């Protein structure tokens, strides 16, 4: 196809010169039957619009080259190329027309044909079943002929990936990292002059869309940790492996966007939850909050189970699946980086986590009860007897935690070794979250159905063990001071497991779908807790402080257990097998 321009502005005809015009039919038959006239009309209309925006008023004529018969290998001409390869999960036909120069203010909007910011390429995506045109191809990207050994064409539209620094909408690769314009400018300013940023907290501030400007130190620290550098190569010069990784992430974000989990959902706006009621749980499980119906046990109030009183709104937790004819879809990532077809869930990711947590909590308390230890017997236990009793009481809770982890979206899709590492790194942390449901602040005791065990009766001669006892008590107090509902404890527990996937203190693997789930659950927790604290910034810092305290206490448990094993290896071998399996190996 060629474009001719006539009129008084012939010296500006370079505006309409195109570098290529390419499409891929699924079959030779489709290549013959393709509706070329529809494409010609669309591109002609877009070209006229371009000239109108440029104050040019040429008359245009579209010339179509003579058709050629296609042989088995396909045919090519200078204007169009036929490649009869099967293309999975891509539109039937992709057209692009590139112009050498485009006015800065030129934009084409609408659902049929678009041109992006600073782009010089008009793109049509044609479905032969509907003859519908839509799409955009980013700067410096073009479709090429597919090699014979490939079945999927990936256009690296990196702008669908959120900013790696703050989670805002990205604008491309800047200084070697996919970032938004704000973080690009911030990093540029930090490198253009001598700066001396200071962190007012513990150098672990949250950097996101809401508070990215609150701590320049932590923002720059995150930029550097992600690899931003003035010497970083541009996207077009990335290695093949790096490009493939980015393209995989692009596909993931397209899947999420198609199913209602785009960056707006993953990195959702921080706004108060709706005024109408969501999941309401019996808060009387905390003895110092005497509201609701409770069961008195030795002077303390607890509740074993919680039930929803009203349906949970779909947008309560920031991850609202899209709906087609009443059917909701959510994206899952399978092992190896591929994405299966959308599945139909009963609930959104946060609701499923809460439901699984409630089920395991109910099952655990029904089968094993809580705090079945007579506190009068504890002072008479030997050191080995104390460890054995502790491990025996913890063992059924560990089993419930494992079942809960298996129900979290994406967990079972991870490699088995990764699942084991995640459990080793988080089982004790989640045990603290479960225990917080039965902790009474006034008595500083864990209250069960038969007994209440105050921390004052727990005395250890070993310094590491005594420090662990004190820190467990302090950690439970800090969790309970958040006044969390059981639904919020569920979100906190799931977040502690999944956070290790990408965090510096965890196992540090790259599984973008699991990371997206973790972000969704984290935002759900923030939005649910925020009304009680007053502002989002304080909410984030409070929850982060609690998470840090939980992780530190889990490390103390590991250190105390290691000391016990070294000082009394014979007695440590008598500990339950599951407990030893999860805690005697090195923790990630």
Swiss-Prot record:
Compartments, record wording: Nucleus
Signal sequence bounds: none
Ranges annotated as NR C4-type zinc finger: 163-183, 199-223
Tissue: Expressed in the germline and oocytes and is a maternal gene product. In males and sperm-producing hermaphrodites, expressed in early pachytene spermatocytes, increasing in level throughout late pachytene. Expression is undetectable in meiotically dividing spermatocytes or mature spermatids.
Keyword Zinc-finger: yes
Region (Disordered): 50-73
Null allele phenotype: RNAi-mediated knockdown in the adult causes abnormally small larval progeny, difficulties in shedding old cuticles after molts and larval arrest at the L3 or L4 stage. Up to three previous cuticle segments may remain attached near the tail. Less than 1% of affected larvae survive to adulthood and in all cases have a strong Dumpy (short and fat) phenotype. Defects in gonad morphogenesis and seam cell (lateral epidermis) development. Knockdown in L1 larvae causes the majority of affected individuals to have defects in the L3/L4 molt.
Function: Orphan nuclear receptor. Transcription factor. Modulates expression of target genes, such as Period protein homolog lin-42 and microRNA let-7, by binding to hormone response elements (HRE). Involved in promoting oscillatory expression of the primary transcripts of let-7 and paralogous microRNAs miR-48, miR-84, and miR-241. Plays a role in normal development and required to regulate each larval molt.
Protein family per UniProt: Belongs to the nuclear hormone receptor family. NR1 subfamily.
UniProt protein name: Nuclear hormone receptor family member nhr-23
């Amino acid at each position: 196809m060629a474009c001719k321009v006539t009129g008084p502005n012939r010296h500006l005809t370079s505006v309409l010169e195109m570098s290529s015009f390419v499409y891929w039919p699924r079959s030779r038959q489709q290549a013959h039957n393709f509706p070329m006239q529809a494409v010609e009309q669309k591109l002609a209309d877009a070209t006229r619009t371009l000239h109108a925006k440029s104050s040019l008023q040429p008359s245009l004529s579209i010339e179509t080259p003579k058709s050629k018969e296609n042989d088995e290998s396909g045919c090519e001409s200078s204007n169009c190329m036929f490649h009869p390869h099967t293309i999975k999960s891509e539109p039937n036909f992709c057209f692009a027309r590139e112009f050498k120069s485009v006015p800065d203010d030129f934009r084409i909007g609408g659902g049929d044909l678009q041109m992006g910011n600073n782009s010089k390429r008009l793109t049509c995506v044609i479905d032969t079943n509907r003859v519908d045109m839509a799409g955009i191809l980013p700067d410096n990207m073009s479709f090429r002929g597919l090699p014979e050994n490939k079945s999927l064409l990936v256009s690296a539209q990196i702008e669908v990936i959120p900013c790696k620094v703050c989670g805002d909408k990205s604008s491309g690769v800047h200084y070697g990292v996919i970032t938004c314009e704000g973080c690009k400018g911030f990093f540029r300013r930090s490198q253009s002059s001598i700066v001396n940023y200071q962190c007012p907290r513990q150098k672990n501030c949250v950097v996101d869309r809401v508070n990215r400007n609150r701590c320049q130190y932590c923002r720059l620290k995150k930029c550097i940790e992600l690899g931003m550098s003035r010497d970083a190569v541009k996207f077009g010069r990335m290695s093949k492996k790096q490009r493939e990784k980015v393209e995989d992430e692009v596909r993931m974000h397209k899947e999420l966007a198609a199913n209602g989990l785009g960056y707006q959902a993953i990195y959702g706006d921080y706004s108060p939850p709706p005024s109408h009621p969501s999941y309401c749980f019996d808060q009387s499980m905390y003895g110092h909050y005497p509201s609701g119906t409770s069961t008195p046990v030795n002077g303390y109030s607890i509740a074993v189970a919680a039930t929803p009183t009203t349906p949970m709104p779909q947008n309560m937790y920031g991850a609202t699946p899209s709906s087609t004819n009443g059917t909701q879809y959510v994206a899952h990532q399978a092992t190896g980086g591929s994405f299966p077809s959308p599945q139909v869930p009963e609930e959104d990711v946060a609701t499923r986590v809460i439901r699984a947590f409630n089920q395991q909590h109910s099952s655990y308390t029904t089968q094993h009860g809580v705090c079945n230890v007579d506190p009068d017997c504890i002072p008479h236990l030997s050191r080995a007897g104390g460890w054995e009793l502790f491990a025996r009481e913890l063992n059924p809770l560990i089993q419930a935690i494992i079942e809960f982890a298996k129900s979290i979206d994406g967990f079972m899709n991870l490699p088995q070794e990764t699942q084991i590492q995640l459990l080793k790194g988080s089982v004790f942390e989640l045990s603290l979250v479960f225990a917080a449901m039965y902790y009474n602040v006034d008595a500083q005791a864990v209250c069960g159905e038969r007994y209440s065990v105050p921390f004052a009766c727990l005395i250890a001669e070993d310094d590491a063990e005594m420090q662990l006892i004190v820190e467990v008590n302090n950690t439970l107090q800090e969790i309970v001071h958040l006044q969390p509902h059981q639904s919020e404890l569920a979100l906190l527990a799931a977040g502690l497991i999944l956070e290790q996937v990408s965090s510096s203190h965890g196992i540090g693997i790259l599984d973008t779908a699991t990371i997206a789930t973790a972000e969704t659950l984290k935002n759900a927790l923030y939005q649910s807790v925020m009304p009680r604290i007053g502002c989002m910034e304080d909410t984030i810092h409070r929850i982060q402080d609690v998470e840090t305290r939980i992780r530190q206490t889990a490390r103390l448990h590991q250190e105390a257990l290691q000391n016990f094993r070294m000082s009394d290896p014979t007695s440590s071998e008598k500990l339950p097998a599951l407990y030893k399996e999860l805690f005697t190996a090195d923790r990630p």
